[in-house]
């Protein structure tokens, strides 16, 4: 993978989280494999490459890549507006989080506890989802900027769906942080669209 493709893999994680949040909000449904991929990404430390963060291959990132391609191509027929809004909001929240050492410390202390739950129950277990959602509430929900999720109120009011949405937003912001660490910047999404798409199309085909 090229350095830009490493960035795009992490950005695909942001967009996958956004797509899954939108799907839960509108339908109440989510793929367990995709959910496990994103929640698992919270717990990987010192990966040998970006792909390892998402389980070693990018098959679960396809929907994230597709939404990212739609955003970069700016084609109204393929643009997923709500996921794009969520993804950009996650990139913005990551910038705010980076300035808050206290919140980063809280996240750093509680992720090992969640890791213990994953080892006991598995990554998509309701206890793990609730713990991740609670961590989001205690940290990122306290920031000035909030992510407003739109969908069917019947889905949004179910506690299990609310926990999944918060857990996915936490995982998406983790991917946004990884994207920044790999050299990603928001201006690239405007200025370097064609360059990004050229590197992204092969990822979409191979995943």
From Swiss-Prot:
It is found in: Cytoplasm; Cell inner membrane. It is a peripheral membrane protein. InterPro entries: HflD, HflD-like_sf. Its main location: cytoplasm. GO terms for cellular component: cytoplasm; plasma membrane. Pfam families: DUF489. It comes from the Bacteria. Keywords: Cell inner membrane, Cell membrane, Cytoplasm, Membrane. Belongs to the HflD family. This is High frequency lysogenization protein HflD homolog.
């Amino acid at each position: 993978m090229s350095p830009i493709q490493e960035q795009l893999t992490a950005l695909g994680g942001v967009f996958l989280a956004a797509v899954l949040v939108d799907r839960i909000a509108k339908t109440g449904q989510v793929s367990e494999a995709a959910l496990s991929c994103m929640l698992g990404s919270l717990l990987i430390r010192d990966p040998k490459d970006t792909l390892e963060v998402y389980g070693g291959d990018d098959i679960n990132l396809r929907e994230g890549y597709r939404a990212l391609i739609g955003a970069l191509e700016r084609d109204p027929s393929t643009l997923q507006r709500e996921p794009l809004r969520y993804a950009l909001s996650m990139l913005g929240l990551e910038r705010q989080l980076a300035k808050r050492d206290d919140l980063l410390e809280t996240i750093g202390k509680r992720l090992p506890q969640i890791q213990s739950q994953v080892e006991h129950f598995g990554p998509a277990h309701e206890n793990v989802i609730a713990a991740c959602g609670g961590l989001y509430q205690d940290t990122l929900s306290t920031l000035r900027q909030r992510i407003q999720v739109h969908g069917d109120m019947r889905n949004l009011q179910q506690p299990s769906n609310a926990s999944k949405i918060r857990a996915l937003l936490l995982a998406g912001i983790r991917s946004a942080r990884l994207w920044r660490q790999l050299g990603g910047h928001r201006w690239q999404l405007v200025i370097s669209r064609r360059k990004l798409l050229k590197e992204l199309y092969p990822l979409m085909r191979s995943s």
